[in-house]
């Protein structure tokens, strides 16, 4: 590690429980590595915000929702609520950094950064280094809109100007792929990527996988069946409906086909879709602490998402050496390279790819070998941590 101050405040708008399944799934290994190297690191999240502060925010929002132009527009109310929540967390981060003596603050979205910038200016913390990671593909207003926080064109333009203002004032801006940074610049109408923007990949996870038969036994799966795995939140932008429909169609020819979906969310619609296609007994849902047995037991991994800045589950499946079929969206081509079968967001293309993998073991072996070759090029945790240390200290 380089010389300099050894402390950083990490700031998210998540709850502590999200460290396992949300942003923390990629962030906590970095936090743990920094702590192991003698750093003082705090992970500031929603649970650190006092109840009285949340109550004040809610009362303020209730008054704001009565204003002309806001009262009759629920989408605007939702955006204001999300923005206020993040600005308040950023404000808390500025106070926490001052009170606890942090010399670097890393915020995990630009709306948090807005609140921090306001607090930093108000508290006179001009010497405090700070930066932002953009976790979506492109600008944050695009990412939140695609995730269901509906924004009309006028509101989108205003939010993008606000985002550009915040990013310009940060000491660093990172995204997990170069493609994501390039899209961010296009979304914000910038002529080039600023020099303080950096692409820093997620680190390759260390995996100690069981043999397939042992993994199947531990999960109660039959090793004679063909198991397809999908991982992610059960939300519309993941398009698991395409995966369910494709598997249901293929199951008419391959009755041993089973689909396993790991993730939080409303599974009722997907179950109904499977039931209607006669596939209901072959779809399985789970929320688990340890995904490694599933990677070890699965025969193929599939992602049907319409957007990914990086695609952490894709990356994990690649590192596990699984044959991977992924939609070629966002930063996925950069991360997966030749290690995955890249397809459009299309049921027919997915069926064709899965059909080939089920019917031809040599195809699976070839794709698994490509995954292993691509995985060998992935950065390790030590390299990733060193990139962040350079930002925090310089």
Q: Which residues does each predicted region cover?
A:
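A charged, aromatic-enriched C-terminal amphipathic alpha-helix characteristic of glycosyltransferases
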Residues: 22, 362-392
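Membrane-proximal helix-turn-helix segments that form the acceptor-binding/catalytic region
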Residues: 94-95, 153-173
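Conserved donor-binding/catalytic core segment of Leloir-type glycosyltransferases
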Residues: 222-238, 244-247
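Nucleotide-activated donor-binding/catalytic signature segment of Leloir-type glycosyltransferases, i.e.
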Residues: 271-288
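Short alpha-helical donor nucleotide-sugar binding micro-motif in glycosyltransferases
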Residues: 287-289, 294-298
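Aromatic "clamp/platform" in nucleotide-sugar-dependent glycosyltransferases that forms part
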Residues: 306
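Short hydrophobic beta-strand element within catalytic cores of glycosyltransferases
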Residues: 323-326
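Conserved acidic donor-binding segment of nucleotide-sugar-dependent glycosyltransferases
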Residues: 340-348, 356-362
